[in-house]
Amino acid sequence: MATPPKRRALDTVGEKVLRYETFISDVLQRDLQKVLDHRDKVYEQLSVYLQLRNVIERLQETNHSELYMQVDLGCNFFVDTVVPDTSRIYVALGYGFFLELTLAEALKFIDRKSSLLTELSDSLTKDSMNIKAHIHMMLEGLRELQGLQNFPEPSPH
């Protein structure tokens, strides 16, 4: 006996709903998480460079030739150390490369690097907003496909 047309339509609607839900959870949400994780790493790098800028500015203000400090060797194990010459600093360029720079050169590098990281974080934020818009569009499509009514947004109190 043949399946009635209405039953076949419901089966295809159910299959479409399942495919859309799978696409949302397996592709879009995973992509969104990757973009947000990448943006968080960029924010961490930006934070490190801004901290370095503050340290360099304090070094320039105090004009000390020696610096006493504690260095973290790992696992929160600190040792006291003396930096004999604070006129030059080693800056991590990336990919394991370090460069010895004067404090003024380091500030220029930090300004350029922080502006690039800010642009990258802005781009990643736009990408995440696009992915969120795609997720919202897919959910609206699912709502229409299932014939659900649009529920009102909860009002903020």
Swiss-Prot record:
Entry's localization field: Cytoplasm; Nucleus; Cytoplasm, Cytoskeleton, Microtubule organizing center, Centrosome; Cytoplasm, Cytoskeleton, Spindle pole
One CC-aspect GO term: spindle pole
Major localisation: cytoplasm
Molecular-function annotations in GO: beta-tubulin binding; chromatin binding; transcription corepressor activity
Any single biological process term in GO: microtubule cytoskeleton organization
Superkingdom: Eukaryota
Quaternary structure, from the entry: Homohexamer. Component of the PAQosome complex which is responsible for the biogenesis of several protein complexes and which consists of R2TP complex members RUVBL1, RUVBL2, RPAP3 and PIH1D1, URI complex members PFDN2, PFDN6, PDRG1, UXT and URI1 as well as ASDURF, POLR2E and DNAAF10/WDR92. Interacts with LRPPRC. Interacts with androgen receptor AR (via N-terminus). Interacts with estrogen receptor ESR1; the interaction relocalizes ESR1 to the cytoplasm.
Family from the record: Belongs to the UXT family.
Role summary: Involved in gene transcription regulation. Acts in concert with the corepressor URI1 to regulate androgen receptor AR-mediated transcription. Together with URI1, associates with chromatin to the NKX3-1 promoter region. Negatively regulates the transcriptional activity of the estrogen receptor ESR1 by inducing its translocation into the cytoplasm. May act as nuclear chaperone that facilitates the formation of the NF-kappa-B enhanceosome and thus positively regulates NF-kappa-B transcription activity.
Cited PANTHER family: MEDIATOR OF RNA POLYMERASE II TRANSCRIPTION SUBUNIT 10, PROTEIN UXT
Name of the protein in its database record: Protein UXT
Annotated source species: Mus musculus (Mouse)
